[in-house]
Amino acid sequence: MKILGKWLLASLLICSMPAKAALDIVITEGVDAARPIAVVPFVWQGTGPMPSQISDVVMSDLARSGTFSPSDELSLPQRNISTLAQFDAKAWMAQPAEAVVMGSIKPYGADKYLVSFQLIDLVKAQLQSGAGPQAANDLVIDSRETVISAAQFRQYGHRISDVVYEKLTGIRGAFLTRIAYVVVKHGEKSPYQLMISDYDGYNEQMLLRSPEPLMSPSWSPDGQQLAYVSFENRKAEVFVQNIYTQARKKVTSFNGINGAPVFSPDGKKLALTLSKDGQPDIYVVDIATSALKRVTNHYSIDTEPSWFPDGKSLLLTSERGGRPQLYRVFLDSGKISRLTFEGEWNLGGSIAPDGRSIVFVNRTNGKFNIARMDLETRFMQVLTSTRLDESPSLAPNGTMVIYGTTYQGKQVLAAVSMDGRFKARLPVGQGEVKSPSWSPFL
């Protein structure tokens, strides 16, 4: 969204980033608060060069999570180990880490590789360092092996990261997820590109290219489709597109605003903003039948819907109180209630996967920051300290928020943990990237 005075358009025009920015992530805050972990480079048991180093993917994932801080490789007391039998607990006594990830990679046929890894409880190892070999197996938190192709190395690295994250935190990892966004390359004949990539920027794929704006991609709950706004026909229209078959369907094409589409939890409907009957209001449309239900009917602006997990109510931004604030409306009864009161504006809300909290843009004293609010206690916490933050998108495990901000006069993509301790920024490259949307678990 463009913040100063144009908050309705803001719901459709979200943040900027370089297409590969996640590869160059700059952690700006929170390293000291992260939990130390050791990732030993996986041992190559073949001849010739290894296809790629899976442990590099694991280290990067854990660092980007904001929860863990991987040790520098040169500080590790053992570096050429891959099994518990090679693990020397006494050598690790002074290592400031709570767990060790180690593994091996060896050829297993034509373009096949056997990848093994173990997650070792270093705290327990340090406590039991004098207990002898009989206690060694107690140190293994998880141990797995699988056969993969060279093309699957990055994907399996993310899988290992998911296992490590969940075993140590009890929260499902979100490293095997993707991000959708719109790339804008000014000066080109068709500057607008609808893109998807892995959450870290790799495996980028173009879904659509257009000379006219593309906006507001939103993932279906099964991760197979995107809803988005296109101006390719010189007017705002909402489409749904399958990311695998490329098949797409025009869902709405009314006069005026067709914007901010978001899938229902069952994937059968879209909540969106339409102005076909006058002022912008919230509607729900059945994707298969095109049946339309009006949810709000007010002379003020209602926009930016977001579904609660049970599918029975929506979060929305409304000016009905005089300024943009967040409201909740129940679909059956039409009952609507205001949720936010602190600050001058609160808008662009998203709901945490557990339905217990929301993240949104809060304006206080002219500064736009990302904030979160507990829906039971109504306690609000401002998560960021910059001035022009916008468009938060939650990871499917609810631990991180991606948002847009301004850095050195340019829009960039940034991330913040849900407790506000960890912050990262993605430096600007060529072109702009707008409307980031984090996928569900895939």
Swiss-Prot record:
One GO cellular component term: periplasmic space
Predominant place of localization: periplasm
UniProt GO BP: cell division; protein import
Highest taxon of source: Bacteria
UniProt cross-references to SUPFAM superfamilies, sorted A to Z: TolB, N-terminal domain, Tricorn protease N-terminal domain
InterPro entries membership: 6-blade_b-propeller_TolB-like, PD40, Tol-Pal_TolB, TolB_N
Keyword terms of this UniProt record: Cell cycle, Cell division, Periplasm, Signal
Keyword Cell division attributed: yes
Signal peptide extent: 1-21
Gene3D superfamilies from the UniProt entry: TolB, C-terminal domain (2.120.10.30), TolB, N-terminal domain (3.40.50.10070)
Subcellular location: Periplasm
Keyword set includes Signal: yes
Functional description taken from the UniProt entry: Part of the Tol-Pal system, which plays a role in outer membrane invagination during cell division and is important for maintaining outer membrane integrity.
Subunit description: The Tol-Pal system is composed of five core proteins: the inner membrane proteins TolA, TolQ and TolR, the periplasmic protein TolB and the outer membrane protein Pal. They form a network linking the inner and outer membranes and the peptidoglycan layer.
Protein family per UniProt: Belongs to the TolB family.
Protein name: Tol-Pal system protein TolB
Source organism of this protein record: Shewanella piezotolerans (strain WP3 / JCM 13877)
